[in-house]
Amino acid sequence: MRPVLVVDFGSQYSQLVVRAIRECGYYAEFASPSISAAECLALSPIAIFLSGGPASAYKDNAPKLDEEIFNCGIPIFGICYGFQLLAQAFGGSVKKANAPEYGPADITIVNKAFFSGQPDRQTVWMSHGDSVIRAPKNFCILSTSQDAVLSFCNRDRTIAGVQWHPEVKHSRFGKHTIKAFLSSFAAPNWDPEQTICGTVDSIRKTVGCKRVLCALSGGVDSVVAATLTHRAIGDRLRCVFVDHGLLRLNEREQVEEYCSSLGLNVSTYDASDCFLSALSGIRDSEQKRKVIGREFIACFSKLQERFDIKPHFLLQGTLYPDLVESGATPGGATIKSHHNVGGLSDNLGFELLEPLKYLFKDEVRKIGLQLGIPKHIVHRQPFPGPGLAIRIIGEVTNKKLSILRAADAIVRHELRDWTDIWQCPVILLSDVQSVGVRGDSRSCGFPIVIRPVSSDDAMTADWYRLPYDVLARISGRITNEIPEIVRVVLDITPKPPATIEWE
């Protein structure tokens, strides 16, 4: 499949560019700014998108693209910094803006090249401190402001760019612009629901005659990965559900029940004592993730002794956002280690099999429904592999886990009909003693944080506006039913700047 390459220059919105292109029906993936012209040509991309970024295109140390790429005949679309980079490369002029622009801005379209069917006046999302003050010679200006060029294209419309961020939802017609550019060069080639056969074939070719061990968490990602792999290799897949003692209330029984209904042969391995012992005394969130990753591998190593033939591959439901946050994409910075990415030991003893690693959550859900997986499994709220360990701020103990399980069960029960909530982590601030009043006496206890969020892909998220009566009912139940908790707090921080999980 020919990709659209997204060269990431460090924008906070780069992941949204990939997602927006996919939503337009084209397969997109990241590329490093250091990619050479030869490497580009080898991939035969439909087009190249240049992302935004914090640098200034006119500075000597600014990240650049291999200039030979501009001579390869590959269509190129620049966004923000990428737009300025194109202006600089083709002889235009970029300077520091008289005033930076951050947030919504109204623009006027003066040439409909990629804006057919869009209003002449529209609101877009800006985030820049530099401006293009002169377009390259023989380029058509498509929109302007009082003192800057806001978009342009060359005469044959193969090189184009915009100063704003069309990938951000606040740019209402942004996806229309992206699709208008791409549709000039190729028909759509991406539908996650139509990738099932290709993914199954790829798994079959990769695995060959070897065996696969699946680290099944019970979430939609691992269930879809297991179902695809089972289609590819049948009984050579062995699924193991590791009970690490960090699960929610009754979760083990629920996972065993619905995996059995899907025809997956699942063995349960109780390793709760091992995990809790390894986590003893550890308070740092990154260290928790690393320890949990190592313990998972230790479990799988022990499990190998039960098999007549050792599995060669370890199957995981790693998704694209996991790779991005773990710094595993070209030029990416590590935001947090994921137990199934950066938390794994280099000495696995297995070769990783990650058939979903270039997909977003909503794409996986579409595939899950196409595979016939029940809706209540497909739309199950995401739950982190490290479990409740990263929802306890501080050291993990059995007592704290019991408190958090009870609070989490209350929240999940009260929000059971709120299907448009992407996720609602419940966090125990176990390092904080908060003062309360019970009866006529002073009391002390833990605060609990609830974090309901709405999202499409976990790359960005906003806090979910629950009605006050629902919040009051949740708070009342938690503080009345769990004596160790005296305070309930609502987290209203979007992502960015905060990640969805606290740790």
UniProtKB/Swiss-Prot annotation:
A GO molecular-function annotation: GMP synthase activity
Domain of life according to the entry: Bacteria
Domain GMPS ATP-PPase intervals: 190-380
The keyword 4Fe-4S belongs to this UniProt entry's keyword annotation: no
Occurrences of domain Glutamine amidotransferase type-1 (ranges): 3-189
Active site: 80 (nucleophile), 165, 167
Keywords: ATP-binding, Glutamine amidotransferase, GMP biosynthesis, Ligase, Nucleotide-binding, Purine biosynthesis
Listed name of the protein: GMP synthase [glutamine-hydrolyzing]
Organism (species): Tropheryma whipplei (strain TW08/27)
